[in-house]
Amino acid sequence: VPKLMIIDYALAPEYLEAGAEGMLDIRVKNTSSAQKAKNIKFSLEEESGEILPLKTSGGYCKEIKKGGEYTWQIPIRAIHTATSRPHSVSITMEYEDENGLALTAVDQIILEIRQQVRLEYDRPIWPEKVVPGDTAAFSMNVMNLGKSTLYNVLLTFDIPEMASGSSVLLGTMQPGESKMGS
């Protein structure tokens, strides 16, 4: 009985940015030393729906000889709102042996999606008057305009003749969140 399995895969580019396209190459091997696999139908599915095929989700190969290999190429796209994380993608291979017996194999691959970081800030709010020797405080609004959670956000500032190398840890910022650092 022929047995198909994914032995390698490659994504170009190396990872998908949300909203971007890529080409996925999936290398399949028939591990049988006795029979070829024929009428092979490939399909791709990512459970969250954040990775989609550009055209059809399927592909076809007439046969893979015993011990042979085949590379299935499928153009894919990550939707604009895709989460920045590794995504598990199912590859299903439906095929027949030489006698027409229907067989199915399913493998999982991992594709990385990244979201562009968008961190912006308002102008600093200064005290109206600063007297030498006093501690002058200022504040600044920092906004996460991206779709990814930002961790360990650190606001570092250098104010000539007042403060040098001071920092404020804003911590974790969820998408769409603003924090005031002072």
Name each model feature, range by range:
Residues 77-84:
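Short, surface-exposed loop/turn segments at beta-strand-coil junctions that are enriched for proline
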Residues 1-6, 48-51, 108-120:
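Proline/serine/threonine-rich low-complexity linkers at boundaries of modular beta-sandwich domains
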Residues 10-16, 61, 124-130, 170-171:
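Short beta-strand segments of immunoglobulin-like
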Residues 31-50, 145-162:
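Short acidic, flexible loop segments centered on an aromatic residue
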Residues 18-33, 129-151:
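Short beta-strand elements of extracellular/lumenal beta-sandwich folds
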Residues 46, 60, 89-99:
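Enriched for extracellular/lumenal, surface-exposed ectodomains of secreted and cell-surface proteins
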Residues 68-74, 177-182:
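Short strand-edge motifs at loop-to-beta-strand transitions and within beta-strands
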Residues 47-59, 158-167, 177:
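Short beta-strand and strand-turn-strand segments in soluble, beta-rich domains
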